[in-house]
Amino acid sequence: MKEKERTYIAIDLKSFYASVECAERGLDPLTTNLVVADTSRTAKTICLAVSPSLKAYGIPGRARLFEVEQKVREVNIERRQKIQKREFTGESTDERELAENPELELQYIAATPRMALYIEYSVRIYRIYLKYVAPEDIHVYSIDEVFIDATAYLRTYGMTAKELAAKMIRDVLEQTGITAAAGIGTNLYLCKIAMDIMAKRVQPDKNGAVSYTHLRAHETEA
């Protein structure tokens, strides 16, 4: 008898440490320019996280602090040239404000790492997953990433894998302010690929909550 095709969901919390710091400050993690780094060290210190809006300027997720400072300077030189003024009228760490007002200087928040707080958030989010699936069907890959065997739950909830992923992630967003990307696949490898290579490149939906990509085994065959 042919074995039933299984469905796995991989969930990754976007720029997790940076998103937690934004959530703690009541800021939007998708539009706030923020890095998590210990500024008491040298400029060569590695940022533990970079917010999505700063990454959009070409700053990598594990940049050194001096790379962030250099890129911000470059961006501000370009902004000043466009307005043809020597001085900015103000500054902002929010991309929406910066887009609306070219005369504002780009700034960013440097948040000191708080590992105990990030672990606390991770535990809270894991408990949210437990509202939908049993612990034996959740594999914790890292502090910000899990794999879920959703096979048995799709019929129970009368949902597609995409709908179940959306429900869980929107719950996480509402309860914690943290956004995520999800990948769906017929095995762990495919859902990981769907999330890492495809879903993370898609802009969050209208709720700012989730992007999804679904890969099946036959779709990857030559």
Model-based region annotation:
Residues M1-R216:
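Gly/Gly-Pro- and Ser/Thr-rich, intrinsically disordered tail segments characteristic of DNA damage-repair
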Residues A217-A222:
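A short, hydrophobic C-terminal helix/tail in secreted or cell-surface proteins
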